[in-house]
């Protein structure tokens, strides 16, 4: 794939011609390895491997011809469902390669002036660390997941991203043909990871393009708007210092407009949060409803739910955020007297829910529903060192993700559950008791695999900061300071697991019977 990618990087970047990629034999082998469903049965995996190995130029050409002629149902339904899933995986991988090439050219300075970022979770954490001096209200928007398939094709044609007519025609045939899959095995096709990734990929491009046009409107209406784009920092794993901006002098009649348009906006998946003044929130409630209604060509605003949060109830990506007034007192001395004054500023204080993490650990098999540690039976086939390594890696992932929380001291409970579950797993494997295992492995495990969080965090930060910041790190108290260790791409499954459960009662989603996105709500 590397050689093929290097040879065709110029074609992908300039000519936008993706149709020949679908006739490469190794292309489907790569797609099958990337998008294979780990929960599929052994028979399904063997059938997928057989179909993947038997793919050739004539097989793909014959299958594409049947898709366009609507004759796929003539053969056995199980075989064709797997073949259609492989075609969807090939389409997804082709689009992924194309946009990855465009993103690389944009970061290197060779691309255009506008590029979409599909890994925007880095900007969310930098956004959560900002202060909101004029913001007192928040608005939550649930974007509908229903998109007509022709809007995807029209999007590519209007933006001139892909000029390959054959590729777009095949994509249109695939998406429009899904309503006719009455004889095929829909369960295998809809649950294939390649199809879900294809639909999610197209949906994310569509919504991101709508947001880019929305930001352009904000720039026209808002004077002196500072829109910070964190897309170019997508490859970094930490933010060590905020950018210092030189504020120009503001005239008296311009201060009100600056306060009025001061807002914070962030989106992850189908859920977005807007924080601003109460007047701004009321105006944007009307604006968002009509904006997404016209973008999705809805006759009515069904499927779009706008909810105004209270000041202490903002839930996003596994965190619960609340505002807290940070007061700074000043003593102003006059010629004959002095008086006290204060400066009030709103700050984000993120917290994580212990109950949500307990549910996640119970699903993973570390504890029961009540939080009591149990042995993880799926790890009994590994060696003791592998069990320690897996448990330690899982703990570090949780600590990376929640080290910026206000209540990160509660992570000691999670650490205790993982540690005791590890002991029970080893005791069950050796048919021994927990007391014997703790006497034998307790000191070694705590010394090697569970170091103190402060020392571990300090070593982690010092290894990644520049030399001039190491002295500063040795002076601050890391037990009270919040740090975002933005190694987020490796723990992306946490956001998918908890993002679905949060605010389930506040949002409603209408999915039609013949909708092309039946699995999108389960995936997000």
Swiss-Prot record:
Main localization of the protein described in the UniProt heading: plastid
Compartmental location: Plastid, Chloroplast
Origin superkingdom: Eukaryota
Entry-linked InterPro entries: Domain_X, Maturase_MatK, Maturase_MatK_N
Keywords assigned by UniProt, alphabetized: Chloroplast, mRNA processing, Plastid, RNA-binding, tRNA processing
Annotated HAMAP family: MatK
Family membership: Belongs to the intron maturase 2 family. MatK subfamily.
PANTHER family given in the database record: MATURASE K
Protein name: Maturase K
Taxonomy of the source species: Eukaryota, Viridiplantae, Streptophyta, Embryophyta, Tracheophyta
Gene, per the UniProt record: matK
């Amino acid at each position: 794939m590397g050689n093929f990618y290097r040879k065709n990087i110029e074609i992908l970047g300039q000519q936008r011609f993706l149709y020949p990629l679908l006739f490469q034999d190794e292309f489907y082998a790569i797609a099958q390895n990337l998008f294979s469903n780990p929960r599929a049965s052994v028979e399904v995996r063997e059938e997928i491997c057989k179909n993947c190995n038997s793919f050739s130029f004539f097989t793909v050409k014959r299958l594409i011809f049947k898709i366009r002629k609507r004759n796929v149902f003539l053969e056995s339904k199980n075989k064709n469902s797997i073949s259609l899933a492989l075609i969807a995986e090939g389409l997804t991988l082709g689009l992924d390669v194309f946009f990855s090439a465009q993103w690389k050219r944009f970061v290197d300075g060779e691309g255009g002036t506008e590029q979409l970022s599909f890994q925007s979770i880095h900007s969310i954490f930098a956004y959560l660390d900002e202060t909101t001096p004029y913001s007192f209200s928040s608005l939550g928007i649930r974007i509908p997941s229903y998109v007509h398939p022709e809007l995807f094709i029209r999007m590519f044609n209007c933006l001139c991203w892909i000029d390959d007519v054959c590729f777009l025609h095949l994509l249109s045939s695939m998406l429009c043909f899904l309503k006719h899959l009455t004889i095929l095995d829909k369960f295998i096709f809809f649950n294939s990871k390649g199809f879900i990734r294809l639909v999610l990929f197209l949906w994310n491009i569509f919504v991101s393009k709508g947001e880019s046009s929305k930001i352009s409107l904000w720039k026209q209406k808002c004077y002196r708007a500072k829109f910070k784009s964190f897309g170019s920092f997508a490859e970094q794993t930490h933010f060590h210092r905020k950018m210092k901006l030189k504020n120009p002098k503001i005239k008296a009649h311009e201060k009100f407009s600056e306060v009025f348009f001061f807002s914070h906006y962030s989106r992850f998946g189908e859920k977005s949060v807007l924080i601003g003044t109460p007047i701004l929130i009321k105006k944007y409630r009307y604006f968002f409803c009509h904006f997404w209604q016209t973008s999705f060509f809805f006759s009515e605003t069904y499927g779009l739910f706008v909810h105004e949060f209270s000041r202490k109830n903002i839930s996003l990506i596994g965190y619960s955020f609340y505002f807290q007034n940070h007061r700074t007192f000043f003593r102003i001395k006059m010629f004959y007297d002095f008086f006290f004054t204060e400066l009030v500023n709103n700050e984000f204080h993120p917290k994580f829910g212990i109950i949500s993490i307990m549910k996640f650990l119970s699903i993973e098999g570390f504890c029961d529903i009540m939080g009591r540690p149990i042995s993880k039976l799926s790890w009994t086939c590994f060696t003791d060192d592998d069990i320690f390594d897996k448990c330690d890696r899982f703990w570090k992932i949780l600590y990376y993700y929640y080290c910026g929380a206000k209540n990160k001291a509660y992570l000691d409970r999670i650490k205790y559950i993982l540690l005791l579950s590890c002991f029970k797993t080893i005791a069950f494997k050796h048919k021994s008791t927990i007391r014997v295992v703790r006497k034998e492995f307790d000191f070694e495990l705590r010394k090697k695999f569970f170091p103190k969080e402060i020392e571990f965090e300090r070593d982690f930060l010092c290894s990644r900061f520049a030399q001039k910041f190491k002295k500063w790190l040795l002076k601050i108290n890391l037990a009270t300071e919040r740090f975002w260790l933005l190694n987020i791409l490796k723990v992306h499954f946490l956001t998918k697991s908890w993002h679905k459960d949060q605010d389930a009662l506040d949002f409603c989603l209408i999915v039609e019977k013949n909708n092309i996105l039946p699995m999108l709500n389960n995936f997000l």
